Amino acid sequence: MNPIVKSFEYGQHTVTLETGVIARQADAAVLASMGDTTVLVTVVGKKVADLSRDFFPLTVNYQEKTYAAGKIPGGFFKREGRPSEDETLIARLIDRPIRPLFPNGFKNEVQVIITVVSVDPQIEPDIVSMIGTSAALAISGIPFSGPLGAARVGYINDEYVLNPTVDQLATSSLNLVVAGTKAAVLMVESEAKALAEEIMLGAVTYGHDQQQVVVDAIAEFKAEAGKPTWDWTAPVQDQALVAKIKELAEAGMTEAYQIEVKQDRYVQVGIVKAAAKAALVAENPDVDTREVDNLLGSLEKSVVRGRIISGKPRIDGREPDMIRALSVLAGVLPRTHGSSLFTRGETQALVTCTLGTERDAQKIDSIMGERTNRFMLHYNFPPYSVGETGMVGSPKRREIGHGKLAWRGMNAVMPSAEEFPYSIRVVSEITESNGSSSMASVCGTSLALMDAGVPIKTSVAGIAMGLVKEGDDFVVLSDILGDEDHLGDMDFKVAGTRDGITALQMDIKIEGITKEIMDIALQQAYGARVHILNVMDQAIGTHRGDISAHAPRITTIKINPEKIRDVIGKGGAVIRALTEETGTTIELDDNGTVKIASSNGEATKEAIRRIEEITAEVEVGRIYNGKVIRIVDFGAFVNILPGKDGLVHISQISDERVANVSDHLEMNQEVAVKVMEVDRQGRVRLSIKEAQAKETAE
């Protein structure tokens, strides 16, 4: 074995790429390290293309092994199972920038597997995974227009920080990941605390500039370790067939794409395509129908893009910067804690908000450590939203990714646990879709949270921008349709407040997207965002003054931390009885904070009363109403508070001489007693006669 190793400094870490030792039967395998975080990236491609497919079959699998963090998996089977949400999101993060770098027409199946085998708790594995993937593809011989670089950018004390540690990210107002080639930015994923557009654009530029060291290092690594490039050539188009299809379908396609209603437009486009295909088959029964379908798709793209770039109205008749008609409703469902219906053109989201207690929070145990997520946002995309049938079940990668993007958009304005001690779950049901459903989810979430009485800092709106670029000419599109996303060159999603950006996601399919274009897109997005916020604020401009009557009300009290064990009781008996008998949910913190949750106010009051009794300190000189629980020769023991008993000595029962305690007291008798003393050992001395004397005096 002859290892080939390339190391370079990258920000505050050393990155090492190694090949030639592990997984040598794969087309390429790279062991990539950043500090002590190490991933094994393998690439395998099939040498024979599957021409029956009309798409590029690329699969990216990212898997975190618990042994990487020195842990044993939980659960019965004690082994890793289905991908977690974090693993799914990182797989998408890797997939998005590499997919455009494979050549058009390449249909060979390619699988990339990234396995995290060692993890430093201060260095997240996503950036080194992207770098390792780029290196593995570069040396594999598979046609790939890399290398690709990747960087994480933080913003701390008004300065950009390259690849910040986990601790640094905790104090950063920005968490941005950017990936690109030597010449172009291809992908951006970020979360921010309402930062200005120029700061966000500066972070993208900074990250792309800094990652050039990665691109150069991988190029050198490829020169030493790269395999010969596959002998692959792009399929040659039959120009006569291209011309014939244009003759048969261009006019009909142009007319169809002036129909504003999506489903009607799709029907007409289908008719035009079917007629053209039928005419071609009638003329030549041996024509390759798959190639015909591909060329019809290319013509469709050319028609739509040509109209936009020439200054003609968009598919639905809008100008480039126009937003579709908005309909905003809050409080649309009677029993949910909060709800909204947000409609933008033919995209619609029904969003609900549910409030719960701290125990309802999501507990996540990953290789980066344990964490608790109080705010959850789930996005569902049922097939009926686009007029189709399909499988319904567990969320797909796209649904997980869109939900996380909407979560990032809202996270900056969420209240702290001290401000609002609830767990919050938002669900966005996409009931109609024609572009930008994730940004509709952001708008709907903001409305539903306000309807639920969640004190978010301000409203948040989201907008999806697009781009059509031909040569030096380009048009930036606001509020793109699904077709404009599919047929355009850029998908640029921006969420934020009036003050700044909270989330930015960008996927670029071509090179040549300049800083000028991105700046125009950001400024145009700002105008669109403010317009949407104005409409949203007319429906509900601030959070409700109170939470729903159907939501649990959380009341917080403080007790002496030393009394926590008294509230819990032996084996949890006391707190179990409290929750069962009052119908409340009770949570205890080590610092003495007690949270009582119930939708019934009287039940909450009863629980508080009983907790206060349990934790109350016995006061010397105070008179208590107690119950006799034990009689002995020298006196009686009386319970004055839950778990608090005291002794009434025989001499303290009456002013008269008492010969037999049982002649004066009996079991379970209620008596008034005065606390005379609490000694150092906590023993309580009580007096009945002193209590009677005080009552007589009063």
From Swiss-Prot:
EC number: 2.7.7.8
Subcellular location: Cytoplasm
Enzyme's top EC category: transferase
Cofactor: Mg(2+)
SMART domains assigned: KH, S1
Function: Involved in mRNA degradation. Catalyzes the phosphorolysis of single-stranded polyribonucleotides processively in the 3'- to 5'-direction.
Subunit structure, as described in the record: Component of the RNA degradosome, which is a multiprotein complex involved in RNA processing and mRNA degradation.
Protein name, as recorded: Polyribonucleotide nucleotidyltransferase
Organism: Shewanella frigidimarina (strain NCIMB 400)
Underlying gene: pnp
